[in-house]
Every structure is written in structure tokens, then in C-alpha cells.
A protein has these predicted regions:
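Short alpha-helical transmembrane segments in multi-pass integral membrane proteins
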Residues: 1-31, 87-152, 192-224
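Short runs within selected transmembrane alpha-helices of multi-pass transporters and secretion channels
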Residues: 1, 77-80, 149-168, 174-186, ...
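Transmembrane alpha-helix boundary and packing residues in multipass membrane permease domains
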Residues: 33, 37, 45, 49, ...
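Small-residue-rich hydrophobic transmembrane alpha-helices
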Residues: 61-123, 158-170, 174
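Hydrophobic faces of transmembrane alpha-helices in multi-pass small-molecule transporters and flippases
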Residues: 15-46, 71, 75, 79, ...
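Short loop-to-helix capping motifs
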Residues: 55, 135, 171-172, 198
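Helix-terminus/linker motif at the lipid-water interface of multi-pass membrane proteins
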Residues: 38-71, 89-90, 127-136
Length: 224
């Protein structure tokens, strides 16, 4: 004997599942996130390709430093995920005070963590890099550019946090625009500065790239 549901309940459930407005909103959010992800991947792929043009040893040294950045991202992305969930819930409930509280709490923790990670990696990098490569020239290049990687980590928390906040608030278009603009700036400045200053110029462009993402999203923040 099958389970019977009232027709009105079935219709209500169908309308909730097949709500075109909400479905299109979901499609738009996911498409924006996809573009943002492609822009992120493209940025780091371009950074690696540009480093390769400066020589195999430079490419290897940059790859070592990117491991520190990747490691830090696991920590900072955790705070961004918490901000996405908790600030997103407050935003959906139209609770402005709670929204600001959640943003402030998670951002302060992320900033402290980023500072500790940056200082820790800068202080320990000269000891850990030799474990990652046996090539002395690669080691020296990596240690020489270690301050730029540490600086990137320190300033990157803002972009991570704002990404999480905007995703939670389903304001993904701003996040997409910020990442695409930052990618264009990275390619333009990276091409210019790497030609003038070599790998130092390339790293400075990467730091500017992550900063631009945060600055642009900060300009969008008042719409939340």
C-alpha cells in the first residue's frame, strides 16, 4: 500500500523545487563562481608560465614558495567558509547586526592567523626550504624571494574573507568582477615588471593581484 500525500502538499513541494526565479539565481551564482575559479587558476598558471620564462631554477624556486602559500590557504579558507556560512545565515535572515558581528569575528581571527602564518613562514623558511629541494641555487632563489611569499600570505586573508562573505550573501557577481579585474592587472603588471625587475617584479605583481581582489570587493561591500 503506497503512501498518499494531499494534492496541495505535492503542488507546494513541486513549486518549491521548480521555482524558476530561485533556480535561475542558483545558476547565476554558480556560473559566477565558475568564472572566478577559472580566473584564479589562470592567474597562478600564468604566474608559473611567466616564471618558467625566467629559467628552470626560477620556476622551481617559485614552485617551492607557492607550497607555503597553498598551505596557508587551507587555514585562511577555513575562516572564509565559516564566514560564508554564519554571515550568510545572518544575511538571509536580514539580521544586519548579527551579520556585522559574524563578519567582524571571523575577519579578526583570519587576520591574526594570516599574520602568524606569514611571520612563521618568513622566520622558518630558510630552514624548511632545504628540505624541499637539494639544489643549492634553487634554495637561494627561494630564500631570496621568501619575503614576497610571506607578504602575500599576510595580505591574502582579506580576499579570502570577502570571497566567503559575498558567496554567503549570494552576491557572486562582485566576487567574479573583482577576480577577473585582478587577473587583468596581474598579467599587465607582471609582464611589465618581470621584464624590468625579473622574478622580484613578478612576485610584487602577485602581491598586488591579491590586494586588488580585496580592494575591489571592499568597494562592493556597502551593497550588502
Amino acid at each position: 500500500m503506497g503512501i498518499r500525500y494531499p494534492k496541495a502538499r505535492v503542488v507546494a513541494l513541486k513549486n518549491r523545487i521548480l521555482n524558476r526565479k530561485k533556480l535561475w539565481a542558483l545558476v547565476h551564482v554558480n556560473s559566477d563562481i565558475m568564472v572566478r575559479t577559472l580566473a584564479l587558476i589562470s592567474g597562478f598558471a600564468w604566474f608559473a608560465q611567466q616564471g618558467a620564462q625566467l629559467g628552470d631554477e626560477t620556476l622551481a624556486a617559485n614552485h617551492l614558495l607557492l607550497q607555503f602559500i597553498t598551505l596557508s590557504a587551507f587555514f585562511l579558507d577555513g575562516y572564509a567558509n565559516v564566514a560564508e556560512m554564519r554571515a550568510g545565515q545572518a544575511y538571509g535572515a536580514v539580521d544586519k547586526q548579527r551579520f556585522q558581528t559574524e563578519v567582524r569575528r571571523t575577519t579578526v581571527l583570519a587576520a591574526i592567523t594570516a599574520a602568524l602564518l606569514g611571520v612563521g613562514i618568513y622566520a622558518s623558511g630558510s630552514y624548511t626550504i632545504p628540505w624541499l629541494s637539494q639544489d643549492h641555487h634553487v634554495q637561494q632563489l627561494a630564500i631570496q624571494h621568501l619575503p614576497y611569499a610571506a607578504l602575500y600570505i599576510v595580505v591574502s586573508f582579506a580576499a579570502f574573507q570577502l570571497d566567503g562573505i559575498f558567496i554567503g550573501a549570494t552576491q557572486s557577481r562582485a566576487m567574479r568582477n573583482a577576480t577577473v579585474l585582478a587577473l587583468a592587472v596581474l598579467i599587465a603588471l607582471g609582464t611589465w615588471w618581470s621584464a624590468l625587475y625579473g622574478n622580484r617584479g613578478l612576485w610584487v605583481a602577485l602581491v598586488v593581484y591579491i590586494t586588488i581582489r580585496a580592494v575591489v570587493l571592499s568597494c562592493y561591500y556597502p551593497i550588502l
